[in-house]
Curated annotation (Swiss-Prot):
Gene3D superfamilies: YheA/YmcA-like. It comes from the Bacteria. Signal peptide: none annotated. Belongs to the UPF0342 family. Pfam families: Com_YlbF (PF06133). InterPro entries: Com_YlbF, YheA/YmcA-like_dom_sf. It comes from Streptococcus suis (strain 05ZYH33). This is UPF0342 protein SSU05_1260. NCBIfam families: PRK13676.1-1.
Length: 112
C-alpha cells in the first residue's frame, strides 16, 4: 500500500493550525487588527519589506534612506506592545517552520 503524500500534507496543515504557537499568533493578530495604530504600522512595515525584497531580487542594494526607514519601522514596532508580542509569537512559530522545512527538504537535499 502506498502513502498518499497529499493526505500527509493536509494532516500536517491541520497539525500546524492546532499548535499552541499558531493559536497564539492567531490571537495576537486579531488584537493587532483591532488596533488601528498597530494595524497601520504592520501594514506599512509589510509593504516596505516587500519593496526591499523586490530591490534585493533585482540585484539592488538598499539605499541609506531605505536603511533609515527600516530603523524607523523597528522603533515603531518596538514601541508598540501589540506588535512586539506579534513578532515574538511569530518567531516562536517560526522555529517549527524551520524544523519542518529541514525535515521536508532533507531527502531532496540528498539528491543534490
Amino acid at each position: 500500500m502506498s502513502t498518499n503524500i497529499y493526505d500527509i500534507a493536509n494532516e500536517l496543515e491541520r497539525a500546524i493550525r492546532n499548535l499552541p504557537e499558531y493559536k497564539a499568533v492567531e490571537a495576537v493578530k486579531v488584537s493587532v487588527e483591532g488596533n488601528s495604530e498597530a494595524k497601520e504600522i504592520l501594514e506599512s512595515y509589510i509593504s516596505f519589506q516587500k519593496e526591499i525584497q523586490s530591490k534585493l531580487q533585482a540585484g539592488e542594494i538598499p539605499t541609506e534612506a531605505d536603511q533609515k526607514k527600516m530603523l524607523d519601522f523597528n522603533k515603531k514596532v518596538q514601541g508598540n506592545p501589540l506588535l512586539t508580542e506579534y513578532f515574538s509569537k511569530q518567531q516562536q512559530l517560526g522555529t517549527y517552520v524551520a524544523d519542518l522545512e529541514r525535515i521536508i527538504f532533507k531527502p531532496l537535499n540528498e539528491l543534490l
